[in-house]
Amino acid sequence: AGKTILLHAEQGFGDTIQFCRYVPRVAEQAGHVILEVQQPLRGLMSTLSGAAQIVSRGEPLPAFDLHCPLLSLPLAFGTRLETIPSQTPYLSAPSEKTSAWRDRLGNRERPRVGLVWAGDPRKSLPGANRIDRQRSLQFDQLAPVLRVRDCEFYSLQKGDDALEQLHRSALDHRVIDWSADFHDFSDTAALIENLDLVIAVDTAVAHLAGALGKPLWLINRHNTCWRWLLDRDDSPWYPTARLFRQDATREWDSVVARVQAALRDYARDWKIGSAPAASC
């Protein structure tokens, strides 16, 4: 107590979103927490409890007594599956941005579903690129999902290659793409706050939806990342997540078919008022 501790992000955006949940616990013990994050996350992190100061990576750092990488905090707290701090939401969008999206969207007539079908290819990093090719879909592979007529679909996708897939597709009319207005993660979060459901591959936006407490359907690769565990369709990290796993590497058809069937049920339940709706 009485010390100033620097908590600094490492690895990707999704890792920062997942493990910033420990910041309030650190603040209870250390007193003053400085949180250093990637610049596109700074606005979003302003909604996180426990951080007295937030700085962008590369900026001069204030004085501190101790430091710890975010991804070392589960070890520092002796985390086990049953002790994961799983309460959500622990992040939110700035209220003025959420209100602006609400006004833009207008009246809700059908469930609003956000989509992310690809990650960052990171072509200069062979290992990361290989994993991205395993976790990502081509946009047209989502065609069965887009045929669920009683839903509105919104792109939460970033990246020129993935968006080109959308805009050259015969199904592009089924998806509203306002991604040019996503300047940082707080903008994406504000749109998600106005949606009912997010369907995403294993990307930072999946973590964002989970951290916001939004229903998340994760389309997950067969050789899964460690954090999603094995042989379960839920997540101890995100209570609102439902996992749809591949049966074999790069075999997406059966996964997408299961998502399509689940979405048909969801849209039917939403229509009669029994599906969870967005809070906004």
How should each PLM-predicted stretch be described?
Residues 1-280:
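Catalytic machinery of carbohydrate-active enzymes
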